Amino acid sequence: TMARRIVSAGSLILLTAGALLIPTSAASAAERDGVCDVGEVCLYYNSNGEGSLSDFSGSIPNYGGSQPNCYEFKGPGNGQGKCVKNNAASVWNRTGRSVTIYYNSNHSGPSQTIPDGEPVNLRPELKNENASHEINDNVKLCVNGNCPV
């Protein structure tokens, strides 16, 4: 009957409209979520990319020395919740550019430049002695882990 067709069509319209209102999850990487995504530099609490990690998509002039005013390790594992400053032992650079880790705040003092795509342990003078990092925007994009310095 005509009334049945109208009800069926109305139900279909409501069902379609309802489906459009269901939220979808974002597929993009989220900084500071404890996951080392492409486009980020990740500092790890332990050597060899182990333990909790802290992920960044930009340069940080000062990690901050104590809670609640510090960047902290976010991922699961040893060190989770601790401040990054003077606690990082290894780095995985996934930014597409070289990243320099500094002993002092404000990008100064002894440093180590990490090429893109290369997870590395920090040198002894920077292991657990790090206060800032800089993503080197003035350096050409790295290719297959090779960064012009």
Roles of regions detected by a PLM:
Residues A3-I13, A17-V149:
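Compact beta-sheet-dominated domain cores in extracellular/mature segments
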